[in-house]
């Protein structure tokens, strides 16, 4: 795979995976390189992107309803599912408090963005916080973390199918059951995901989501199951595929290291991500492929990530990673190359089931 600036120096032939070195730059160095205005949300701009997405979604519904043609529906499904995903990314900014400096506004727009696409805003926001605090940590990361070679060999067939073959539909299951080998639900305040002080936030999002399910049920009662399928269920599935595809590719790549124990640090984990180019939809889904800078500084609004990325590249040098491959090729390569990591070692890499574990 061609990378923008580096191959991650994957030690294919080394006898140890211990990593006791320090990075040649600090979090402070990276922050100093980024223009101060990149950290400042612009409420007008943030609201523009939210209402832009809502407007496009509304127009797509109007056109689909007017034409009511099976020739158009496949186009509608793809476009509307993509816009559901774009709306999710707006709520993602709200969850990071990078939409605005007003928490009430972030929570309001977050719920307006996430509830219609059946995402519990606060429940997801909190678990996503756990992911960002532990990115690249095999033991503590929340999503898309690797299994070890021994875990892979002992994994039941049904779990292998879910993890390696139908993972692009995994998100709804994750909301109910959390990631493999972890317990908890995004809907229940008693889940280990949440602190007692977060109870009412979680309940609020859950109640609103139940209300959305009730609304869908009422509309289905009025207009029938075919209405639900044509106008909501299929776009929702497209959205789920987008969400799982993008988040999987953020952190699943043979050249990206994973850490255990004391060799893991926040910054090492944050830069163990990769930027990817999603072509025509790159800006439609709000530059979410610009992921390295986002993981380092969560409070940068999505519309400032490209500028921030260009600022940190010279500081990071060979530690900055960007794939120039087409997305379909990156997905294929990750699927056939990233099955498990070695059972031991403080710095390890994915390997394929068809190859010996990388040292």
Swiss-Prot record:
Keywords (A to Z) from UniProt: Fatty acid biosynthesis, Fatty acid metabolism, Iron, Lipid biosynthesis, Lipid metabolism, Membrane, Oxidoreductase, Transmembrane, Transmembrane helix
SS bond partners: none
Signal peptide boundaries: none
Region (Disordered) location: 1-20
Compositional bias per record (Polar residues), positions renumbered to this chain: 1-15
Origin superkingdom: Bacteria
Protein name: sn-1 acyl-lipid omega-3 desaturase (ferredoxin)
Species this chain originates from: Nostoc sp. (strain 36)
Gene designation: desB
């Amino acid at each position: 795979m061609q990378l923008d600036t580096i191959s991650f120096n994957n030690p294919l032939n080394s006898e140890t995976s211990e990593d006791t070195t320090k990075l040649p730059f600090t979090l402070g160095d990276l922050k100093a390189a980024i223009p101060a205005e990149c950290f400042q949300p612009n409420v007008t701009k943030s609201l523009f992107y939210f209402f832009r997405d809502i407007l496009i979604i509304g127009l797509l519904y109007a056109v689909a309803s007017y034409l009511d043609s099976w020739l158009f529906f496949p186009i509608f499904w793809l476009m509307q599912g993509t816009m559901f995903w774009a709306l999710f990314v707006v709520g993602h900014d709200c969850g990071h408090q990078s939409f605005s400096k007003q928490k009430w506004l972030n929570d309001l727009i977050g719920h307006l963005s996430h509830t219609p696409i059946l995402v519990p805003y606060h429940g997801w926001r909190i678990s996503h916080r756990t992911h960002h605090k532990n990115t690249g940590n095999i033991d503590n990361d929340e999503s898309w973390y690797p299994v070890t070679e021994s875990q892979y060999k002992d994994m039941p067939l049904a779990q292998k199918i879910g993890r390696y073959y139908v993972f692009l539909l995994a998100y709804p299951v994750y909301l109910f059951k959390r990631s493999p080998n972890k317990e908890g639900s995004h809907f229940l305040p008693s889940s280990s995901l949440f602190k007692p002080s977060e109870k009412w936030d979680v309940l609020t999002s859950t109640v609103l989501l139940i209300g959305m399910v009730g609304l869908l049920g009422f509309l289905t009662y009025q207009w029938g199951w075919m209405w639900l399928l044509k106008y909501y269920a299929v776009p929702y599935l497209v959205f789920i595929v987008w969400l799982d595809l993008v988040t999987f590719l953020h952190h699943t790549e043979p050249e990206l290291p994973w850490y255990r124990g004391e060799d893991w640090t926040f910054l090492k984990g944050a830069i163990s991500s990769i930027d990817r180019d999603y072509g025509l939809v790159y800006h439609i889904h709000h530059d979410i492929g610009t992921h390295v800078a986002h993981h380092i500084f969560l409070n940068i609004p999505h519309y400032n990530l490209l500028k921030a990325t260009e600022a940190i590249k010279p500081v990071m040098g060979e530690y900055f990673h960007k794939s120039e491959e087409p997305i379909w090729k990156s997905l294929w390569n990750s699927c056939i190359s990233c099955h498990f990591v070695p059972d031991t070692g403080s710095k390890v890499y994915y390997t394929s089931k068809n190859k010996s574990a990388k040292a």
